[in-house]
Amino acid sequence: MPKRDAPWRHMAGTSKVSRSGNYSPSGGMGSKSNKANAWVNRPMYRKPRIYRMYKSPDVPKGCEGPCKVQSYEQRHDISHVGKVMCISDITRGNGITHRVGKRFCVKSVYILGKIWMDENIMLKNHTNSVIFWLVRDRRPYGTPMDFGQVFNMFDNEPSTATVKNDLRDRYQVMHRFNAKVSGGQYASNEQALVRRFWKVNNHVVYNHQEAGKYENHTENALLLYMACTHASNPVYATLKIRIYFYDSITN
């Protein structure tokens, strides 16, 4: 004997909803995306042992949340003699862009922007490379040292720059990268995009002053050195540098 239909089946505008249906926004993409998502988001016990042994924590050791951020937006005139800027200048305060006490940890650095040439320089046939160095100053004092004071170069060429022997204990190059632009009448590449993201886990220590300045650092200041390889044609850099940091629990 067949079962009698439920009364709501004959009502207009109603339909039975299946419990086993997949009504997620990505459900129409097929089973391939579901399998891929399931594989990416698989539980930790299904991953290789190296993922379980060397998993880095979200919050650095000895620190507490929330994750704070500070941005440095500036247009730089990069020449052959080099330029330096401090990217760990954090003012003391209670905001999401301030440090609570003397100590904090810069977990990551994000550099975004472009390098470009002036219209007059763009018409000259030449190639110019801009080199960036992310340097940790372990014992900052006074004002940041110039590019030529920190790096030793052969024939004053920035592409051969290495930290001087007597400063290797104080200055440590954490990352280095370069970008290239070229000028000319026909095949010119007048600008180049810059995008870098690094995990540094750099523990910065300030003195009792509240202002975020290089002179108030006592340990591990982060410096960004910039220099171009062409001696007579400068390059401009429009950069937005973000650092993500956590306050120390010992403040």
Curated annotation (Swiss-Prot):
Pfam families: Gemini_coat
Keywords: Capsid protein, DNA-binding, Host nucleus, Host-virus interaction, Metal-binding, T=1 icosahedral capsid protein, Viral penetration into host nucleus, Virion, Virus entry into host cell, Zinc, Zinc-finger
CC annotations in GO: host cell; host cell nucleus; T=1 icosahedral viral capsid
Region Disordered, annotated ranges: 1-35
Subcellular location: Virion; Host nucleus
Motif (Nuclear export signal): 96-117
unnamed zinc finger locations on the chain: 54-71
GO biological process: symbiont entry into host cell; viral penetration into host nucleus
UniProt entry tagged with the keyword Metal-binding: yes
Compositionally biased spans, kind Polar residues: 15-35
Motif (Nuclear localization signal): 35-49
Motif extent (Bipartite nuclear localization signal): 3-20, 195-242
Entry's Gene Ontology molecular function annotations: DNA binding; structural molecule activity; zinc ion binding
Family recorded in the similarity comment: Belongs to the geminiviridae capsid protein family.
Assembly, per entry: Homomultimer. Binds to single-stranded and double-stranded viral DNA. Interacts (via nuclear localization signals) with host importin alpha-1a.
Function: Encapsidates the viral DNA into characteristic twinned ('geminate') particles. Binds the genomic viral ssDNA and shuttles it into and out of the cell nucleus. The CP of bipartite geminiviruses is not required for cell-to-cell or systemic movement.
Stated name of the protein: Capsid protein
Organism: Bean golden yellow mosaic virus (isolate Puerto Rico-Japan)
